[in-house]
Amino acid sequence: MEKESKRKPRILCLHGYRESAEILKKLILRWPESVTGKLDLVFLDAPFPAKGKSRLEGFFDPPYFEWFRFNKAAILCAAIPGMQREGVALKKVPKIKFVILISGAKFGGPSFGVPKLAINAFSSPINCPSLHFLGEKDYQKKDGEVLLECFVDPQVIYHPKGHAIPELDDSSAEIMLGFIEKTFPNFVTGADQYNWKPKAKL
C-alpha cells in the first residue's frame, strides 16, 4: 500500500533563450541517475519561435524557441513565487512549492528591468525552497548573487563553468540530493501538503 502512495515530485523544466525542450532534456539527463531518478521532469518548448541565431547551432539541431522575448526562463521563475504572494500571477493554481534556478537573476537587479506585474515580487524575502546554480565564469554571476539575497535560506551549487548547465560532480550531486530530500519529504509519501521550515542561519 505504501509503495502505491509514493510519487516523484514533478518539475516543470523551462529552457533558456533560443534553445528548446529537447536541448534542455539532453543537458539535464547528463546528471547522475541518482538525482534525475528521484524527479518527474517535464520539458516544454517556449511559445515563440526564436529570431536570430542560437549559440547552440552546430551542437543541437533546431528548432529553437524563446520565452516572452527576454533572456532567461530562470528570471521569470525566480519572480513567480513573489508574484503569486502579491496576487498578480497564477492566482488559480496552487502556490509554487520550490524553484531550481540555473544562472538565475532578479528583475530589478543589476542587469534587468522590472515588468509591471513583477514590481513587488521581491518586496520581502521569498519563503520558498530554492536551489541556485552559480557559475564562476558566468557573465551573469553578479545577478545570481543578488538573487540569493531575495530568498529565505537559499541553497547554492557553485560550479567552475560559465553561463551553462553544468554536469554534477560528487559534491554538487550531494547538495542536489540534500535539497530534494529536504524539500520533498511529503511529496514522495503522497501527502498533499508539505511544510517548509528554513534551517537556522549559522
Q: What are these regions, as identified by a protein language model?
A:
Residues 72-114:
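Primarily recognizes the serine-hydrolase "nucleophile elbow" in alpha/beta-hydrolase
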Residues 144-145, 149-166:
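Catalytic histidine neighborhood in serine/cysteine hydrolases
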Residues 107-109, 134-141, 163-164:
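Acidic catalytic loop of the alpha/beta-hydrolase fold
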Residues 2-4, 8-71:
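Serine-hydrolase catalytic machinery in alpha/beta-hydrolase-like enzymes
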Residues 50, 162-175:
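Catalytic histidine-centered segment of alpha/beta-hydrolase-like enzymes
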Residues 125-126, 130-134:
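Short beta-strand/loop motif that positions the catalytic acidic residue
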Residues 169-202:
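Catalytic active-site module of serine/aspartate enzymes centered on a nucleophile-bearing elbow/loop
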Residues 26-28, 113-118, 140-149:
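Short alpha-helix in the alpha/beta-hydrolase fold that links the catalytic acid
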